[in-house]
Regions:
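ER/Golgi luminal nucleotide-sugar-dependent glycosyltransferases, focusing on the catalytic module
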Residues: 1-133
Length: 133
């Protein structure tokens, strides 16, 4: 059975998202994941879309993907929807209750969610493009 494994997103931080506590060393994780799939399936193709441009060589060397895209996260800025597009035009009214930290956290979470799903869709898109070529 042939298997396609799609990796996407940004390398996580040691103490949370967005590189908090410094970025993780993903070498061991990549090797374990690759070994798991390669040992279980005879024919595995890897595809990668990642915001971790600085990890491009490492990821490509370990996974040897059929296709990969590494790009800065800022490429999606013009595609992001605003809070108002999701009916959250009154988010400022929550400041009195939760303070500015809530709004800042919400904006970061909102950007993260859109980035995640964009990257997920790009990894599937490059897999599809490869399979159609």
């Amino acid at each position: 059975m042939k298997l396609a494994v799609c990796f996407y997103g940004n390398v996580g931080g040691k103490k949370g998202s967005h590189g908090h506590g410094g970025y993780q060393d993903i070498t061991e994780h990549l090797i374990k994941n690759k070994n798991h799939f390669d040992n279980k399936y005879k024919d595995v193709d890897y595809f990668v879309h990642s915001w971790s441009v600085d990890k491009k060589d490492l990821i490509n060397n370990v996974l040897n993907p059929k296709s990969s895209i590494f790009e800065e996260n800022s490429v999606i800025n013009d595609q992001l929807k605003s809070l108002e597009d999701y009916g959250l035009r009154n988010i400022n009214s929550y400041e009195n209750m939760f303070g500015n930290e809530f709004k800042d956290f919400f904006k970061i979470s909102f950007f993260s969610a859109q980035s995640r799903w964009y990257s997920n869709s790009k990894s599937l898109e490059i897999m599809k493009n490869y399979s159609n070529s």
